[in-house]
A protein has these predicted regions:
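Alpha-helical transmembrane segments of multipass membrane proteins
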Residues: 71-75, 98-99, 125-126
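Transmembrane helix-loop junctions in multipass membrane proteins, especially transporters and channels
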Residues: 24-31, 79, 106, 130
């Protein structure tokens, strides 16, 4: 279970580093005033930066429930092939969501990836509630 969790951590750091790089580049080039980043007010960042910021924020919402599930599975030694398949499926769908969000950003496609990932997360929690 640690490997799917680690993969999601890597995705989160990847998006976070891209966001930091975009903010630095936008401030350095003058596209966004550096003072904007103090309170996130007073300027309008480019759409590409907004997408990165929203995606980074998304990675601290529902995935928190995934990390809790993973920690319980590890602590109780409950990992099974089915649980690992659900976990990897969840991580894969979060990756798909990120690729769509930061790429062509079609809302319906992004929502379907979000919905499917949350269905797997709910399945993990239902299984966990059943076995505990």
């Amino acid at each position: 279970m640690i490997y799917p969790m680690f993969a999601l951590v890597l995705l989160t750091f990847f998006v976070g580093i891209r966001l930091g790089s975009a903010r630095f580049a936008n401030a350095r080039s003058g596209r966004v005033k550096g003072s904007y980043y103090r309170l996130m007010q007073g300027d309008v960042p480019p759409d590409s930066e907004v997408k990165l910021a929203r995606n980074f924020s998304n990675l601290f919402e529902a995935p928190v429930l995934f990390y809790v599930t993973g920690a319980i599975v590890i602590a109780k030694n409950l990992a099974t092939p089915a649980v690992l398949a659900l976990a990897w499926g969840y991580v894969a769908l979060r990756l798909v969501h990120t690729v769509i969000h930061l790429g062509y950003n079609h809302p319906i496609h992004r929502f379907l990836a979000f919905l499917a990932s949350n269905a797997l997360l709910l399945a993990l929690w239902c299984w966990l509630a059943y076995v505990l």
